[in-house]
Amino acid sequence: FHGYTYSGIPVSVAAALAVQDIFEKEDIFNRAKELAPYFQEGLFSLKDIDVVDNIRGYGMMGGIDIKTDGRPGKAGLATFKHCYDAGVNFKATGDCLIIAPQFICEKKHIDEIIDKLRTGITNYQKNQKN
């Protein structure tokens, strides 16, 4: 047998099978599919913030581009810090905020994410004016 150090480890295989069982029993993918339009609606509600340049999304994933001041990455990092201080964590790449809520979330969690994103992005915007 030839494989990799991470191939065929019984504990890992058992864990993966258990996760698949949970996804099937709790209908995780269909729950996420049903929540996706609600998440997208919340995400696109942020387009009224002046520093938001572009919003795009698909399913339970979204990207928010922050307008730059000519220095790539600076606006994205600063916005990320304001959002983190507001209580939401995500990936920021360059000037794009990448949002992907967990599949197990509920509407109340999406509301919280969007509220904290709004707070963080708005705080960044206010800081830019000072």
Whereabouts are the PLM-identified features?
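Conserved N-terminal phosphate-binding loop of PLP-dependent enzymes in the Aspartate aminotransferase
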Residues: F1-N130
